[in-house]
Amino acid sequence: MRRRLSSVLINNQCIASQRHYHTSRPEKPTKKASSHEPTHKFTRKPWEEVPFLTDLKEIEDPEEALSLFHQYQEMGFRHDYPSYSSLIYKLAKSRNFDAVDQILRLVRYRNVRCRESLFMGLIQHYGKAGSVDKAIDVFHKITSFDCVRTIQSLNTLINVLVDNGELEKAKSFFDGAKDMRLRPNSVSFNILIKGFLDKCDWEAACKVFDEMLEMEVQPSVVTYNSLIGFLCRNDDMGKAKSLLEDMIKKRIRPNAVTFGLLMKGLCCKGEYNEAKKLMFDMEYRGCKPGLVNYGILMSDLGKRGRIDEAKLLLGEMKKRRIKPDVVIYNILVNHLCTECRVPEAYRVLTEMQMKGCKPNAATYRMMIDGFCRIEDFDSGLNVLNAMLASRHCPTPATFVCMVAGLIKGGNLDHACFVLEVMGKKNLSFGSGAWQNLLSDLCIKDGGVYCEALSEVISI
């Protein structure tokens, strides 16, 4: 039986306010248990999991989660902080913010002491929902829950504001840190620097960086990576390299991402050899090349049609005992398929599976599109089956390509199978995709395949 939380709150006004940090044995319930109704005995040892939390994990529907919360409460279970926080997280994740507000009122009424991490999570969920004002409101109310507010929650709020395009508000809260008796750390400055760089305001970002040094806050590798990345994207490699030297002088060790940003900048300028040289120079600076560095070089070679050189880099990785991941393999698969070297791409797919690297949706999609490109629809269908078995799903465009190709090849049974799969997956072409299919089969080729298409659709 479900009860609205508002009625529970009214009934609970009669109960004396006290903190609850443990469970007590309730009276035995008289009503029949539902599928999610608690049946546990509430006496437990300290190391045992709370029965409410165990049941809550099995529920996806937020309304059912609320119902379970009330059922436990009616049976005498005394909810503590882990119960409240778990329920609040689940409700916030589903964006049931009205229920979140009600539970928070109950938390305050019961004087349950909360951790700052609860409010940080709520601020993030409000930010993802675009509810900036609610995020700010939660931040202001943290102390009213007998919780100490630190720079961590301020950083969370500033980040949410920056992500939602509220840079001025973010700077205002940053400037007000002193009034809140909080001292900004490197994370605080990094968030603002990133925000200004996203707005292409280099001068403002530099001003924040200077302020960071004035306050004697040590810049981190993230700080420099943000600045170097911006300069590389804007083709100012001279300044980017100067910043690299500056961070080394300050004994801030560059990481693989730092060198990756510089390498990508050099590749964009057509200086592949310089980028490759930099990758090997980084070892002398105490930084081992990683997947990101090899990926940048392989992507650049692929774009320039130098796929065989990219394959040599893959072999070099193996010699250095750097295990390629799905991203690395996908770079090769993509460019091989683009160059219509699809059988080679398929061998790469087979190799990655033998090496224990699972293909992702992008891998399968590129392979299917590649086989469609060379009009080998039977092989494409085999890859499609493997993709579906791996619980991945092609895009409507890939389905259209497969259906059109199979119909043109006279393989109507397999075309029907593909449409059947779409139906089982509750997928639809969409009006645009259907138009493309009709155009491909009934217009471009003089309408010779219209009858076959009609037959497939009727089946």
Curated annotation (Swiss-Prot):
Its main location: mitochondrion. It holds the Pfam family PPR_2. The keyword Mitochondrion applies. Residues 19-41 are annotated as: Disordered. One of its GO terms (cellular component) is mitochondrion. PPR repeats lie at residues 80-114, 115-149, 150-184, 185-219, 220-254, 255-289, 290-324, 325-359, 360-394, 395-429. Residues 24-41 have a biased composition (Basic and acidic residues). The keyword Glycosyltransferase does not apply. InterPro entries: Pentatricopeptide_rpt, TPR-like_helical_dom_sf. Keywords: Mitochondrion, Repeat, Transit peptide. Residues 1-20 form a transit peptide. Disulfide bonds: none annotated. It comes from the Eukaryota. It is found in: Mitochondrion. Belongs to the PPR family. P subfamily. PANTHER family: ATPASE EXPRESSION PROTEIN 3, OS08G0290000 PROTEIN. This is Pentatricopeptide repeat-containing protein At1g07740, mitochondrial. It comes from Arabidopsis thaliana (Mouse-ear cress).
